[in-house]
């Protein structure tokens, strides 16, 4: 299993920056003042680089929502009980969750991936069963999982990305569902990015001031208890993470290995992205951070990564909702790149002096 994990990381190559000159020249030749479409031009350029194609396409889009339960929920860090995780999975399977609505709106297919929910689901066409275990260990008392379990979750996520590539998807998105998962996400950020727990920890599902302070203490305890295990990115993931977070990290690695761009959702999905980037820094070339989450600390994470999210809508739901909405912006960017007329081909006068 470790060999497959190392092979996955080795399979990721940087984006093709040799195409930058030609792609930028094409963008500048489009019938508009140069740079007037702002970040849409930047997005199109990055998409060309990631896909290594001067004629990029987005014919199919898919969002994978990874679900898992967390032992640390027993510490009372969430406003909701763990039973809500399988309940929300069922809502997604029935088509009634926010991510279902948004995925339908943007024309993206949706898969709900059971990475570690403490429940046995019946078969369903939208459900992908990749359960590693029925929930993680309580990180406030010890590690979330073993390194082998973390690798297993990573490889499962990577395989889903490879399958999506083989099925003809050109743009992938991440989502998640798991009560209490802002707690392991904050713990991972604290260790992997060196940000203070107090500044990275937010209210998650809407906890009050007293429970927020308790949550911060739980995270600090988790980081302290597991300090000896957090010597590598993989060890840190195993000690403090979640099965859905590990699945997202693998999904990103697998997509990057296939040169498929990934739209990262919010606070928890970004933790999976940080894990992937720490394991293999060049995956950053393939990531589009969808939105700035309203969850406290996400801004600090984006600043630490030097990332600029596409949207800022005060979202804090997760599920892949922000990723779905940002897919529209990316798709518009690629259509702009491909479908606009150029000064070279159209009877449009260029700027005086050119």
Curated annotation (Swiss-Prot):
InterPro entries referenced in this protein's UniProt entry, alphabetically: Nict_dMeBzImd_PRibTrfase, Nict_dMeBzImd_PRibTrfase_bact, Nict_dMeBzImd_PRibTrfase_N, Nict_dMeBzImd_PRibTrfase_sf
Known EC number: 2.4.2.21
Superkingdom of origin: Bacteria
Catalyzed reaction equations: 5,6-dimethylbenzimidazole + nicotinate beta-D-ribonucleotide = alpha-ribazole 5'-phosphate + nicotinate + H(+)
Positions annotated as active site in the UniProt record: 319 (proton acceptor)
Molecular functions per Gene Ontology: nicotinate-nucleotide-dimethylbenzimidazole phosphoribosyltransferase activity
An annotated GO BP: cobalamin biosynthetic process
Root EC class: transferase
Keyword Transferase annotated: yes
Keyword terms: Cobalamin biosynthesis, Glycosyltransferase, Transferase
Pathway where this protein functions: Nucleoside biosynthesis; alpha-ribazole biosynthesis; alpha-ribazole from 5,6-dimethylbenzimidazole: step 1/2
Keyword rRNA processing applies: no
UniProt family annotation: Belongs to the CobT family.
Physiological role: Catalyzes the synthesis of alpha-ribazole-5'-phosphate from nicotinate mononucleotide (NAMN) and 5,6-dimethylbenzimidazole (DMB).
UniProt protein name: Nicotinate-nucleotide--dimethylbenzimidazole phosphoribosyltransferase
Gene: cobT
